Amino acid sequence: MHVLIPAAGSGSRMKAGRNKLLIELEGESLIFWTIKSVLSASLVSWVGIIGQPYDKQELLKSVKNFSNKIKWINGGDTRQKSVFNGLNSLPSTAEKVLIHDGARCLVGPDLINKCAMELEQNDAVILATKVTDTIKIVDNRGYIKETPNRQNLWAAQTPQGFLVKRLRKAHEMAIEKNWTVTDDASLFEMLNWQVKIIEGNSSNIKITSPLDLKIAKLFLKDF
């Protein structure tokens, strides 16, 4: 299985003043823990880190223990463009790919393998967790318009897995139609292509704030 890891987090909400994936968690960078988790999955054979050229030296230094197992890919000015660059940098033999957020350093190898195996029967899969809070849809003035049934609501995570040809086609159509999305599964939705949900777990958080970092430290003790 081939894995692409977008790693261009600005760190603005972390108030880090640099790429948030370079922030330390228990003595190692966030990207270190992410790469370690991904490479622990038995079905993973190739990993590409997609980042900005100005971060390349520091990011690669922080994962030097895995330098012979990863490939660097220059990213674009958005996540969407970066993933497209990643797709175009995959080996020609790659048929399936997992896209995983660099800031989700607590994903377990079992979940990565599960996503990979589900791609045997599906063109697209994503990890997600059931929403437990009541969600409100509001208008632009802040007034509630609707309360959707939470039984049908899932919070998307990564990895998100795809057949390479299908995902590349989706990105090409997005460029043609000037679509902008926040995750790759959304492109499939816009094209009315099916995406299968795989239930994830609550520890697979995306670290975007100082509070997330504190929570991650607690999870890491049992990781």
Curated annotation (Swiss-Prot):
Pathway: Isoprenoid biosynthesis; isopentenyl diphosphate biosynthesis via DXP pathway; isopentenyl diphosphate from 1-deoxy-D-xylulose 5-phosphate: step 2/6. Keywords: Isoprene biosynthesis, Nucleotidyltransferase, Transferase. CDD domains: CDP-ME_synthetase. It comes from the Bacteria. InterPro entries: IspD (IPR001228), IspD/TarI (IPR034683), IspD/TarI_cytidylyltransf_bact (IPR050088), ISPD_synthase_CS (IPR018294), Nucleotide-diphossugar_trans (IPR029044). GO terms for molecular function: 2-C-methyl-D-erythritol 4-phosphate cytidylyltransferase activity. The record marks 150, 206 as: Positions MEP for the nucleophilic attack. One of its GO terms (biological process) is isopentenyl diphosphate biosynthetic process, methylerythritol 4-phosphate pathway. Its EC number is 2.7.7.60. The record marks 13, 20 as: Transition state stabilizer. It catalyses: 2-C-methyl-D-erythritol 4-phosphate + CTP + H(+) = 4-CDP-2-C-methyl-D-erythritol + diphosphate. Gene3D superfamilies: Spore Coat Polysaccharide Biosynthesis Protein SpsA, Chain A. Belongs to the IspD/TarI cytidylyltransferase family. IspD subfamily. Catalyzes the formation of 4-diphosphocytidyl-2-C-methyl-D-erythritol from CTP and 2-C-methyl-D-erythritol 4-phosphate (MEP). This is 2-C-methyl-D-erythritol 4-phosphate cytidylyltransferase. It comes from Prochlorococcus marinus subsp. pastoris (strain CCMP1986 / NIES-2087 / MED4). The gene is ispD.
